[in-house]
């Protein structure tokens, strides 16, 4: 039987974008309505059909078209995300591609910042998702000493770095999606190493540069906390901070870090105090020649970060809500169908790996070939979406995942997926990981497709704004107590070996940096969760700038000009992993926002003793 052809209607494609009738126009809150967006959206349909009709087999393409799973980034002929070695860029410079401008290794802090911007912006155009550097403060510290820099000079360079990383310079008029990880204190495995700067080995070690690291962190925090000229937050780079057992909670810059977090909620906090994460894995992935395929490794550095010279070749997310609906009361049948979908997802990822590697070898991704060369250390990623709605449909809405029966089912399902990951690693020789995929557009696509096919399926949201709860997260209106959420999510969060994070959505600015610090400290020391964020809601008025909390119109403007039209404001919060205005969310994510019960400090303060599902670290 011949597979049906899906020809792209050029006129309809352009008009659907221009009149915004195509749901993809707002699927990604980082991509504004623009000429670049029109070009990407139009070209993306051609590329997606190329993948589905020419590269993948019909048996792989059909479940995507029908909504059984979602093959991410079909509109881009590229791998998903990548972590790069900042040390290598500093030592070698940005060069090595024929016919392109070549930069020698940087000798100064300012030129290193310039090469970082150029590198991330250029590599972003060879990948679909996040681009990451680890140990930013450690690797940049030698320049501060060699240049004998004043603090104000560092701030100026940091302003240029951050502003330039927030310019919509990539395909589709988007900002490069970037992540920087900060060590805060020099890691043990780098402490005795002498940096190589400008082809010369310096006479000091990374471990002697704590003062310079402190200046870099202080400057970065100052610029990010200040926001742009209108008081608007910088969306990128997303900062990840490594919180290790020796993290000094009363040390230099800590108050500034948590003042920034209380106001804007920008950082991801990576838990090296009380989790399975190993700080040295950030750098060791790129030099492990023999990986044990019987174990599941962690990608490192959070939902949008990757350890050095690793990342993900691609992501396939399973529609769990549909499985719960189709196999109501039949867990054995549900698991059997899930296994079939995982096998197909794996086939798609193996084909993608082979395809992208072939074209990397033949010059389509020249900078990735220069600085990476091989995809051997890149994971194949399988994710889940709508575990809560899976349970609700499976039980005919008798219970959800907050019920012990639903929770236990989710644990069994995730353990089965992990088991399959190991089998796939041994069968293919490639690394696999399980991710709580952000599914920003996917959650709405799944809900929309399921509503068409199964009108009585149980969904979150409303008929006008349907969505599925992300991964195995709690229902968004379940509790206002962040510590209750941590207690209930700790076990499930630990099942993921790719990106996962628990966002603590706060209704407004946390009352103080000290209160914010205490919330993070208690969370990371009490619970074995790999990553958390504090995510306050805030608003931006064109006249008054930053306003704490949700304000779709400005009260200050109304008080000053009671007879004038209300002054509209942007309301900002995380759309999964990064901050964007709620007004730019897709329909499903708006539905989620409207239903979300925000966490409160009052509820957190009243919680009492924190109870972990695991024994304390010292007793294990």
Question: For each predicted feature, which ranges?
Answer:
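Conserved catalytic cores of very large enzyme subunits
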Residues: 2-376, 397, 403-562, 571
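Metallocofactor- and cofactor-centric catalytic cores in central/energy metabolism, strongly enriched
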Residues: 154-158, 162, 393, 580, ...
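Residue-level signature of transmembrane alpha-helix interfaces in integral membrane proteins
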Residues: 199, 399, 449-451, 590-596, ...
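Extended amphipathic alpha-helical segments enriched in small hydrophobics
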Residues: 378, 382-391
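Glycine-centered flexibility sites
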Residues: 383-386, 498, 577, 588
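Intrinsic, low-complexity terminal and presequence regions
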Residues: 539-620
């Amino acid at each position: 039987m011949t597979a049906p052809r899906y020809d792209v209607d050029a006129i309809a494609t352009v008009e659907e974008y221009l009149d915004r009738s195509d749901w993809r126009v707002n699927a990604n809150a980082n991509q504004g309505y623009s000429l670049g967006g029109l070009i990407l959206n139009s070209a993306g349909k051609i590329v997606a059909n190329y993948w589905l009709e020419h590269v993948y087999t019909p048996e792989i393409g059909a479940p995507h078209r029908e909504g059984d799973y979602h093959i991410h980034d079909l509109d881009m002929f590229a791998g998903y995300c990548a972590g790069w070695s900042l040390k290598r860029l500093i030592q070698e410079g940005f060069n090595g591609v024929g016919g392109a401008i070549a930069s020698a290794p940087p000798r100064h802090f300012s030129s290193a910042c310039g090469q970082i911007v150029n590198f991330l912006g250029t590599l972003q155009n060879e990948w679909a998702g996040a681009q990451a550097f680890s140990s930013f403060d450690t690797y940049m510290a030698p320049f501060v000493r060699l240049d004998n820099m004043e603090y104000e000079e560092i701030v100026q360079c940091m302003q240029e770095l951050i502003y330039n990383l927030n310019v919509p310079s990539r395909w589709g008029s988007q900002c490069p999606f970037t992540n920087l990880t900060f060590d805060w204190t020099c890691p043990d495995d780098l402490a005795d190493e002498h940096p190589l700067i400008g082809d010369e080995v310096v006479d000091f070690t990374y471990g002697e540069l704590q003062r310079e690291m402190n200046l870099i962190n202080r400057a970065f925090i100052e610029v990010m906390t200040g926001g742009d000229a209108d008081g608007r937050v910088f969306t990128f780079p997303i900062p990840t901070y490594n919180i290790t057992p020796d993290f000094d909670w009363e040390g230099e810059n800590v108050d500034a870090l948590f003042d920034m977090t209380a106001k804007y909620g920008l950082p991801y906090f990576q838990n090296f105090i009380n989790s399975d994460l190993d700080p040295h894995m950030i750098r060791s992935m790129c030099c492990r020649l023999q990986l044990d395929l019987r174990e599941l490794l962690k990608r490192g550095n959070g939902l949008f970060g990757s350890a050095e010279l690793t990342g993900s070749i691609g992501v396939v997310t399973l529609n769990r809500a549909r499985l719960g609906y189709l196999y109501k009361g039949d867990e054995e049948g549900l698991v059997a169908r899930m296994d079939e979908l995982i096998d197909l997802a794996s086939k798609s990822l193996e084909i993608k790996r082979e395809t992208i590697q072939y074209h990397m070898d033949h010059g389509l991704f020249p900078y990735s070939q220069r600085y990476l060369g091989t995809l051997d250390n890149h994971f194949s990623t399988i994710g889940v979406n709508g575990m809560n709605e899976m349970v609700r449909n499976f039980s005919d809405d008798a219970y959800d995942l907050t019920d012990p029966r639903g929770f236990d089912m989710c644990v069994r399902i995730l353990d089965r997926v992990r088991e399959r990951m190991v089998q796939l690693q041994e069968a293919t020789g490639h690394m696999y990981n399980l991710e709580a995929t952000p599914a920003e557009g996917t959650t709405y696509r799944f809900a929309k497709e399921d509503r068409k096919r199964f009108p009585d399926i149980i969904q979150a949201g409303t008929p006008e704004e349907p969505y599925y709860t992300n991964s195995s997260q709690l229902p968004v209106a379940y509790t206002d107590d962040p510590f209750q959420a941590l207690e209930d999510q700790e076990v499930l969060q630990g099942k993921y070996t790719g990106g996962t994070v628990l966002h603590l959505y706060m209704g407004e600015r946390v009352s103080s940096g000290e209160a914010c610090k205490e919330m993070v400290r208690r969370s990371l020391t009490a619970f074995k969760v790999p990553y958390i964020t504090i995510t306050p809601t805030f608003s931006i008025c064109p006249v008054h700038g930053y306003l704490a909390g949700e304000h779709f119109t400005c009260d200050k403007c109304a008080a000053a000009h009671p007879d004038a039209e209300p002054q509209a404001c942007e309301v900002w919060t995380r759309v999964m992993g990064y901050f964007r205005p709620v007004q730019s969310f897709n329909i499903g994510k708006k539905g989620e926002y409207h239903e979300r019960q925000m966490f409160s400090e009052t509820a957190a303060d009243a919680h009492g003793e924190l109870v972990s599902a695991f024994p304390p670290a010292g007793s294990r």
